[in-house]
Swiss-Prot record:
Coiled coil: none annotated. The keyword Ribosomal protein applies. It comes from Bartonella quintana (strain Toulouse). This is Large ribosomal subunit protein uL18. The lineage of its organism: Bacteria, Pseudomonadati, Pseudomonadota, Alphaproteobacteria, Hyphomicrobiales. The keyword rRNA-binding applies. The gene is rplR.
Length: 120
């Protein structure tokens, strides 16, 4: 019997496999969503390192947000990751939503990153 955890892992691997096919050596913007916070990082898979990261746990961002688990928080993290990526010289990324549906907080983060100047 297949558990729901196995189904989620398969979905995430399926998404990542598609990303590897179309990435063309671009770094990926990976999103992790917990019940309390949202995290984003830009990863260079060819070198195996994280270039830039942002989350709702960071001090200045945490103080300005009412909650770390709503769309406004995701939007703020998206803006912050785009700003840091531009400083690091990253303009084009591949969006890695993992096993999450492109809706709600994940969509808000992606739209904010696009508004901030990231292309994907």
């Amino acid at each position: 019997m297949v558990s729901s955890k196995d189904i989620i892992q398969r979905r995430a691997l399926r998404v990542r496999r598609r990303i590897k096919m179309v990435s063309h050596d671009r770094p990926r913007l990976s999103v992790y969503r917990s019940n309390q916070n949202i995290y984003a990082q830009i990863i260079d898979d060819s070198r195996g390192c994280t270039l830039v990261s942002a989350s709702t746990l960071e001090g200045d961002l945490k103080k300005s947000l009412k909650s770390g688990s709503d769309k406004q928080a995701a939007f703020a993290v998206g803006k912050l990751i785009a700003e840091r990526a531009k400083k690091a010289g990253v303009n084009e990324v591949v969006f890695d939503r993992g096993a999450y549906v492109y809706h709600g907080r994940v969509k808000a983060l992606a739209e904010a990153a696009r508004e901030g100047g990231l292309n994907f």
